[in-house]
Regions:
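N-linked glycosylation sequons
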Residues: 1-300
Length: 300
């Protein structure tokens, strides 16, 4: 089987037969209950057919195995593992009214990078967290103290991945849901700076980004700096050529917090314009926990 958007595509291979044939695949939960079904239709002489299971995220993530109806033996059963779980991603911009503005909106590049690979959700923080969610991305969005901070802290502690992007708002109002304390914003190559824009260093071993090629054309013109500390080095997943952090991360409870020290737009860097941006986000989503479906849904 392979995933494609909200679909699970299953291929059936057989020896050729002289007449058209049909077969049925049944998706079952770990308790054996049927959750969905689809049909293969093969023409006379065909050796291969495909069935498509259209599954909402909460149901798809409960599928434990696929059975070929009426058949027995190992060739008629496929067990699904974590790779086939859908990972819903919530998006929260710093400014909702301009979030989708082409080229400059907080979510413009994020949505284009992730839409082909993840189920994206947009809503308030409260409503996003009311449903099972693997990843929540905050684009230059400080967290309000009180109920919102408590809810996001609980989301991370219970296994969620919180990805944050820096910006002027976060630099001005940092909060406690960051992997490292922030010090200040640094501008590179500006009229008041003698420093030139920085390139990216190779990703360190042990980073989820290790092995990804670093494009020479990506440069960083502004970033938020981290407070120096004894544990800073172990929390850096990506650096600039001068050694300062580009991405930091920290485990909290069962989950983790990841911070890009630049914006999710091209205002502070060329990173969102590059294919590397897509690859980095895909690796972070793949690191997250697939959500479990809710009980009570029956046959589709």
């Amino acid at each position: 089987p392979r995933t494609e958007g909200d679909s699970l595509r299953v291929t059936l291979r057989q020896s050729p037969v002289g007449a058209p044939s049909e077969a049925q695949v049944i998706a079952r939960g770990q308790d054996g209950r049927a959750l969905a079904q689809a049909e293969f239709r093969l023409a006379a002489g065909a050796t291969e057919g495909e069935a498509v299971l259209e599954l909402p995220t909460e149901i798809r993530n409960r599928v434990f195995r696929l059975d070929l109806a009426g058949e027995a033996g190992p060739g008629a059963v496929v067990l699904l593992d974590e790779r086939f779980r859908r990972r819903p991603v919530g998006l929260l911009p710093g400014a909702e009214e301009t979030a989708d503005t082409p080229l400059i909106g907080d979510l413009f590049y994020l949505e284009r990078a992730l839409a082909p690979y993840a189920e994206l959700r947009r809503d308030t923080a409260e409503r996003l967290l009311a449903r099972p969610l693997s990843v929540l991305i905050l684009a230059d969005r400080p967290i309000a103290p009180g109920a919102e901070l408590d809810a996001l802290t609980r989301f991370v502690n219970e296994g969620g991945t919180l990805i944050r992007f820096a910006g002027a708002r976060l630099a001005e109002r940092p909060d406690t849901l960051l992997p490292v304390p922030l010090r200040a914003e640094r501008q590179l190559g500006g009229a008041l700076s003698w420093e030139q824009p920085q390139r990216l260093a190779a990703f360190p071993e042990g980073s989820p980004f290790a092995g990804l090629p670093v494009p020479a054309e990506v440069s960083i013109s502004r970033q938020v700096l981290a407070e120096p500390s004894a544990r800073l080095a172990e929390r850096i997943w990506a650096r600039l050529a001068d050694g300062t952090p580009l991405v930091t991360a920290e485990s909290r409870g069962e989950g983790r917090i990841v911070l890009f020290h630049v914006t999710a737009t091209a205002e502070w860097s060329d990173l969102p314009l590059s294919g590397l941006f897509v690859q980095m986000l895909r690796r972070l989503v793949a690191l997250s926990a697939g959500v479990s479906g809710q009980e009570g849904e029956g046959m589709l």
